[in-house]
C-alpha cells in the first residue's frame, strides 16, 4: 500500500505502540534506523497525542476505546474501590461503564477486528473478531470471539501469551520474553488480516512499555542509574525492539488495501526517572494518616518481610504457604485496611493513584465532617505542592488536581478527591518522580530511589496518520487520545454519539475526503451500583502478579 493513493478511506487500521515516545523515536528516525516509521512520517501527518491524567494504561486505553473522559467510562486505575469500603479490587474491561466505539461500527454493519487492546478482557460478542489483551489472566480462560478463533490460535501457537512474566527484572529474560510476545502479536495480526474480513482493525504492541520501564537507563548516559558496562550489554535493546516493530509494521502495510487509513498511536509517552515518593509515608509524617501502634513499629517481621521481598522470595513463600485467597489484591487491601487507624486518619493515598479524604458518611470509618472537606482538601493540595525532593530541591508535583477539574460524568464521584501529577518531563531523569502508596517503607524517609524503575509514563504519546484521505506531510498539534474514537467513526461515516468528549481530527484529512461528521443521540453512560470488574481468585492472582511486577499496584 502506498500513501494517499485513495482520497476517501474505506477502512481504518490502528497500530498501537504502548508507551512509544518521540524522545526516543526522533533521533532514530533521523539516523535512518526505522525506515518504515520514517516513511509514515514523511507521507502523513504526525505529532504528539495527549493522554489522560493520569497517563496510565488503564485510564488511557479506556478513553481511547470510548472517546470519553474517565468520569464517564468509570475507570480510574487498574483497581477500583469497593463501595462502602477501604478495599480495592482489580478492574477489567467489564469495569467500563459505557460503550466502545467499535460497538457503533458493528451496529452500522462494519466488521471489526480487535487484537491485544488493553482492558478488553473479558471478550465481548463484537461484529467481527476479538482477541483480548492486557489483564487477560492466561490462555486457559475465554479470550477470543468467536470461540473458534481461540482454538485456532492455540493450535497455531501452542501456549498463547498475553504479557511478560515480571517475576524477574533480569534484563536478558525480559528482553527475550518481550521479543517472543511481540513476534506472536505480529504473527497473529498477519494471520487475522489475511484470513478474516474487516473494515476496522486494531493491534496493540505492548513491548515498548514493558522494556522502557526497566531498560531506559541503559540508553541514556544522563540517567543516574546509567552504567557503562550495563550499557555495553543492553544499551541497544530498546532500538533493537523498535526495529523489530518497524519490520512488523512493514509486513502489516503489505496486507492493507489501498483505501486504508492508518492511525499509529501510543497511549502515553515515556521519560527517565530516578526518584520515588512514598506519599502515605509523607501523610503519616504530617499526622494525616495514622497507623496502629503494632504497624508503626519496625519489627523483626517487617524487616524480614522487606528483605524477602527485595530478594524475590516473599512471593514464592506466600504462594507455597498461604491459601490462594490470601495471595491476591484482596490481601494487599486487607493489610492496608487493618494497618491504618481510621479513627485518627484524615487522608490516604489509594491503589488507584489518588488521595482520598476520610469523609464521614462516605468512608466506613470516616472522621472528616462534610463542612471540613473543602478546607482540608485545599490545605492538603497546597502542602503537597510545596514538597521538594531533598536531593534535587525540586518540587515533587507539577500539579495536584481536584477531581472535578479533570473528570465529569456519571462516574466522576467515584474518582479520588485529589489527583497528583508528579514531575515527569524533566530532561534530567534525577528530577522525575514515581509516586508510591505502599506502606512497606514505614520508618524511612518518604523519598527513595525509583529502582527497579528507570523510566515512567508521560502525558504525550505519539500520533501518525497515513494513507487514504490523509492531508500529507506536516505536523499536527493538539490531538488527544479521546479524539481517536470520533475520528474513526467520522472516517467510516458512522454517527458519533453526542456524549463523546473527543473531537474529529478534521485537520488530518484532505478537504472533502470524509463526509461531514454526523452525530447521534445515543444514551449516555450510567453508573452501576458497584464495581463491575470480576476475576476469579486464580485469575486475580495471575493478573495482580503482572501488574505488581510493572509497579502499577504500588
Specify the residue positions occupied by each region the protein language model found.
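Active-site segment of extracytoplasmic enzymes that catalyze sulfate/phosphate-ester chemistry
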Residues: 39-92, 130-136, 141, 154-167, ...
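Active-site-proximal N-terminal segment of extracellular/periplasmic enzymes that hydrolyze or transfer
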Residues: 1-46, 118, 500
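Acidic, His- and aromatic-enriched active-site or binding-groove loops in soluble protein domains
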Residues: 71-77, 128-158, 223-235, 281-300
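Low-complexity, glycine/alanine/valine/leucine- and proline-rich hydrophobic stretches
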Residues: 426, 430-485, 491
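Beta-strand elements within well-structured catalytic alpha/beta cores of enzymes
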Residues: 9-21, 25, 40, 64, ...
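A long, amphipathic alpha-helix that forms part
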Residues: 6-7, 175-197, 201, 211, ...
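Secreted, luminal/periplasmic, and some membrane-associated catalytic domains
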Residues: 8, 17, 26, 32, ...
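Short, solvent-exposed turn/loop segments enriched in Gly/Ser/Thr/Pro and often Arg
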Residues: 46-68, 115-125, 204-207, 266-272, ...
Amino acid at each position: 500500500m502506498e500513501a494517499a493513493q485513495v482520497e476517501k478511506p474505506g477502512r481504518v487500521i490502528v497500530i498501537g505502540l504502548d508507551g512509544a515516545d518521540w524522545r526516543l523515536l526522533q533521533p532514530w528516525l533521523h539516523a535512518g534506523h526505522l525506515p518504515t516509521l520514517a516513511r509514515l512520517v514523511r507521507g502523513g501527518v504526525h505529532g504528539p497525542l495527549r493522554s489522560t491524567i493520569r497517563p496510565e494504561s488503564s485510564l488511557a486505553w479506556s478513553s481511547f476505546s470510548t472517546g470519553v473522559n474517565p468520569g464517564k467510562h468509570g475507570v480510574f486505575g487498574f483497581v477500583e474501590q469497593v463501595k462502602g469500603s477501604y478495599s480495592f479490587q482489580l478492574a477489567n474491561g467489564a469495569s467500563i461503564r459505557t460503550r466502545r466505539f467499535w460497538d457503533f461500527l458493528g451496529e452500522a454493519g462494519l466488521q471489526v477486528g480487535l487484537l491485544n487492546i488493553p482492558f478488553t478482557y473479558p471478550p465481548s460478542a463484537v461484529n467481527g473478531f476479538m482477541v483480548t489483551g492486557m489483564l487477560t489472566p492466561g490462555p486457559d480462560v475465554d479470550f477470543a470471539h468467536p470461540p473458534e478463533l481461540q482454538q485456532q490460535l492455540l493450535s497455531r501457537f501452542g501456549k498463547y501469551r498475553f504479557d511478560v512474566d515480571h517475576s524477574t527484572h533480569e534484563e536478558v529474560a525480559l528482553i527475550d520474553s518481550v521479543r517472543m510476545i511481540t513476534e506472536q502479536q505480529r504473527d497473529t495480526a498477519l494471520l487475522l488480516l489475511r484470513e478474516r474480513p474487516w473494515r476496522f482493525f486494531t493491534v496493540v504492541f505492548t513491548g515498548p512499555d514493558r522494556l522502557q520501564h526497566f531498560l531506559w537507563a541503559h540508553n541514556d548516559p544522563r540517567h543516574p542509574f546509567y552504567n557503562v558496562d550495563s550499557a555495553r550489554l543492553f544499551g541497544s535493546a530498546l532500538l533493537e525492539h523498535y526495529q523489530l516493530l518497524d519490520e512488523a509494521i512493514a509486513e502489516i502495510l503489505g496486507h492493507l488495501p489501498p483505501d486504508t487509513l492508518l492511525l499509529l498511536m501510543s497511549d502515553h509517552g515515556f521519560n527517565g526517572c530516578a526518584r520515588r515518593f512514598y506519599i502515605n509515608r509523607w501523610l503519616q509524617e504530617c499526622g494525616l494518616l495514622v497507623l496502629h501502634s503494632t504497624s508503626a513499629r519496625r519489627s523483626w517481621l517487617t524487616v524480614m518481610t522487606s528483605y524477602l521481598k527485595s530478594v524475590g522470595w516473599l512471593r514464592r513463600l506466600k504462594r507455597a504457604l498461604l491459601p490462594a485467597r490470601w495471595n491476591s489484591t484482596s490481601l494487599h487491601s486487607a493489610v492496608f485496611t487493618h494497618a491504618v487507624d481510621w479513627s485518627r486518619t484524615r487522608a490516604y493515598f489509594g491503589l488507584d493513584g489518588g488521595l482520598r479524604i476520610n469523609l464521614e458518611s462516605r468512608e466506613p470509618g470516616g472522621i472528616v465532617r462534610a463542612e471540613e472537606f473543602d478546607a482540608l482538601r485545599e490545605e492538603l493540595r497546597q502542602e503537597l505542592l510545596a514538597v521538594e525532593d531533598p536531593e534535587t530541591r525540586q518540587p515533587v508535583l507539577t500539579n495536584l488536581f481536584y477531581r472535578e477539574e479533570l473528570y465529569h460524568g456519571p462516574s466522576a464521584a467515584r474518582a479520588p478527591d485529589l489527583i497528583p501529577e508528579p514531575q515527569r518531563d524533566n530532561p534530567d531523569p534525577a528530577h522525575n518522580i514515581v509516586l508510591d502508596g505502599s506502606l512497606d517503607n514505614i520508618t524511612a524517609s518518604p523519598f527513595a530511589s525509583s529502582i527497579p524503575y528507570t523510566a515512567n509514563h508521560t502525558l504525550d504519546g505519539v500520533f501518525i496518520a497515513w494513507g487514504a484521505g490523509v492531508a500529507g506531510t506536516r505536523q499536527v498539534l493538539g490531538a488527544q487520545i479521546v479524539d481517536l474514537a470520533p475520528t474513526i467513526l467520522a472516517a467510516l461515516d458512522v454517527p458519533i454519539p453526542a456524549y463523546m468528549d473527543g473531537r474529529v481530527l478534521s485537520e488530518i484529512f484532505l478537504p472533502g475526503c470524509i463526509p461531514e461528521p454526523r452525530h447521534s443521540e445515543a444514551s449516555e453512560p450510567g453508573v452501576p451500583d458497584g464495581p463491575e470488574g470480576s476475576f476469579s481468585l486464580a485469575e486475580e492472582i495471575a493478573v495482580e502478579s503482572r501488574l505488581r511486577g510493572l509497579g502499577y499496584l504500588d
